[in-house]
């Protein structure tokens, strides 16, 4: 989104957001300052520098999530349990950004949600609220997303609060019509605490909106460019309380050569699996270098109820396997989180 917005602005082409507004959604210190000014709850954070770590963490509670200021995705992000963890990995994380300092954010262990909204004439309308389920595979590493389930059972309860938050953010960044997504945490009795916001649609998930509700995000984006009235009509007619249920299952792996994918191929043929995509085949090498494939394998599943989707998810997560030439398991083991 950032590159598209910059190119559109330089070329004098219309776009739903200007670079100044996008910068507020890309640079984490500016984003956190925005949340503070808008009165939006967010995990406590600090700018941290290598030569002042003791002072910077004086009033912070561990564990903390350490992030580059304007990195992409989860590159360089890690969980620190002590100042020594930060000192050890400071330089490698700073290398993922154009800034020489990092962001430390107190870890929130509440339920996590991916919230898609579409702004229409300055007002946010909820497209979807999904459960974002994660697992930490190694100490010190950030939990990885293993499943996103649509819609969350808490959608009806949270949609008004989520829309209010997104409307405030849209107004601050100058977004009148277009996509705005939010990642947020929730603890009962505390409301939503926003982690991040982005002026785009979540990757590897928009298909789940279509499976659950019938709304085509691709057509909505096209209408946003060529037929704004039609885009508004689509959004205003949409309900985040989907008629059907869907989930994306995302499998991560160890580095290594792939020899046997027969298990994941068989699971891809199960009833209820709508789309199955292996990113690696026999002879390929799983890697985590920059630019590597995002997952080892991905499944989209759908069903008439959350129970049916959960059951199929458990089956796939329990049986999926990718082996190396010596018969060793390459997949990191996953299981759906219980709520």
Indicate where each model-derived feature is located.
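A short, GP-enriched loop/loop-strand-helix hinge that lies immediately N-terminal to
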Residues: 1-27, 39-47
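Short, well-ordered beta-strand elements within core beta-sheets of diverse protein domains
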Residues: 78, 106, 150-151, 295-303
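A short glycine-rich, hydrophobically flanked beta-strand micro-motif that places a catalytic Asp/Glu
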Residues: 105, 176-188, 233-234, 329-336
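Conserved ATP-binding module of the ATP-grasp superfamily
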Residues: 41-43, 63-66, 77-114, 140-148, ...
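Conserved protein kinase catalytic/activation segment
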Residues: 190-193
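Structural element of the ATP-grasp superfamily
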Residues: 31-36
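Peripheral (often C-terminal) accessory segments that flank ATP-dependent C-N-forming ligase machineries
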Residues: 54, 223-339
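ATP-dependent carboxylate/phosphate-activation module, predominantly the ATP-grasp catalytic core
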Residues: 84, 106-109, 113, 117-175, ...
């Amino acid at each position: 989104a950032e590159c598209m917005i910059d190119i559109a602005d330089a070329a004098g082409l219309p776009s739903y957001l200007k670079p100044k507004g996008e910068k507020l959604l890309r640079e984490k210190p500016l984003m956190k300052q925005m949340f503070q000014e808008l009165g939006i709850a967010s995990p406590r954070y600090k700018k941290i520098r290598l030569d002042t770590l003791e002072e910077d963490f004086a009033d912070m509670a561990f564990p903390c999530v350490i992030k580059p200021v304007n990195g992409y995705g989860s590159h360089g992000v890690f969980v620190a349990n002590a100042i020594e963890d930060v000192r050890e990995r400071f330089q490698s994380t700073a290398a993922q950004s154009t800034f020489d300092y990092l962001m430390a954010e107190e870890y929130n262990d509440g339920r996590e949600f991916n919230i898609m909204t579409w702004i229409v004439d300055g007002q946010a309308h909820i497209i979807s609220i999904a459960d974002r389920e994660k697992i930490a595979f190694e100490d010190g590493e950030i939990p990885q997303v293993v499943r996103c389930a649509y819609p969350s059972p808490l959608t009806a309860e949270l949609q008004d609060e989520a829309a209010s938050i997104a409307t405030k953010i849209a107004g601050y960044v100058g977004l009148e019509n277009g996509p705005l997504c939010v990642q947020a945490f929730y603890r009962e009795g505390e409301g939503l605490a926003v982690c991040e916001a982005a002026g785009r649609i979540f990757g590897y998930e928009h298909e789940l909106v279509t499976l659950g509700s019938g709304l085509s995000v691709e057509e909505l984006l096209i209408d946003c460019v060529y037929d704004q009235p039609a885009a508004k009509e689509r959004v205003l007619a949409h309900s985040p309380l989907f008629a059907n249920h869907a989930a994306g299952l995302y499998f991560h792996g160890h580095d290594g050569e792939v020899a046997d994918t027969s298990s994941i191929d068989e699971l891809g043929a199960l009833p209820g699996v709508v789309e199955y995509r292996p990113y690696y085949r026999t002879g390929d090498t799983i890697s985590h270098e920059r630019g590597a494939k995002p997952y080892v394998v991905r499944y989209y599943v759908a069903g008439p109820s959350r129970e049916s989707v959960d059951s199929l998810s458990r089956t796939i997560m329990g049986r999926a396997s990718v082996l190396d030439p010596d018969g060793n398991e390459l997949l990191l083991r996953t299981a759906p989180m219980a709520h």
